[in-house]
Regions:
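S-adenosyl-L-methionine
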Residues: 1-28
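A conserved structural/catalytic subdomain of Rossmann-like adenosyl-cofactor enzymes
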Residues: 19-223
Length: 223
């Protein structure tokens, strides 16, 4: 991917291995920026390796991601290596926003500790190999406010061939919403941690951003 984007080999350090069980960057400094699209709902060893619950990446949440769904294990891994003033943007399978049990406990840890800066709902059919409408979770450690921005960007795309694509204009509108951090009817909502708690730590964008009613209004009297 680096070579395809013409990034000189001297500017990156790539390691081959299992990120979750054999991380290759233990000796590195925390990262100021992390961008990731980890595999969706892949399997991992999870609780079968009892040592992992004491791993400094996963221990703070008090629970491991399910063996059948490693999504939030990757999220915790990245949070661990995020600098105090850094930002992480992670493309996630939508289930991580609402599934219960261990994943619900990890979401609670992330929200209660004010790490979740924004959740962005993306359009469906953006990525090769899946038509799923994924989302982006934006994490920060040093945040001045205690609220989460929810952005519905599900319509921010154009159809090209058999896939949807984010144009430069689509990307800029999404970035502007995140940077301005204000409520916009049917598009963005700024939600307090208390309100998220009352909603059982659900982070689905549709739970907080009401879609616009585009149905045609019919005057019964005129009919």
């Amino acid at each position: 991917n680096m070579f395809l984007h013409d990034v000189n080999f001297s500017n990156f350090d790539i390691a081959l291995g299992d990120t979750l069980t054999e991380p290759a960057h233990w000796d590195d400094q925390p990262f100021d920026a992390i961008v990731s699209n980890p595999p969706y709902s892949t399997k991992w060893v999870g609780k079968d390796d009892i040592a992992l619950i004491n791993d400094p990446r996963f221990a703070p949440a008090g629970v491991l991601a399910p063996k059948s769904k490693a999504d939030l294990a990757f999220t915790m891994h990245m949070l661990h290596w995020l600098a105090e003033d850094g930002t992480a943007a992670i493309v996630e399978f939508p289930g991580v926003l609402y599934r219960g049990a261990a994943e619900g406990k990890i979401r609670r840890y992330l929200v209660e500790n004010n790490f979740v800066h924004a959740v962005i709902q993306l359009p469906p059919d953006l990525f090769f190999g899946t038509t799923i409408a994924t989302c982006i979770i934006v994490l920060k450690k040093a945040r001045p406010d205690h609220s989460v921005l929810f952005v519905d960007a599900s319509a921010e795309c154009v159809r090209e061939g058999n896939k949807n694509r984010l144009t430069a204009e689509n990307q800029q509108r999404i970035l502007s919403l995140v940077s301005e951090r204000q409520a916009v009817d049917h598009v963005a909502a700024l939600v307090s941690i208390d309100d998220i708690k009352d909603n059982d730590w659900n982070l689905s964008v549709s739970s907080y951003v009401e879609p616009e009613d585009t149905r045609e209004q019919v005057d019964i009297v005129e009919l």
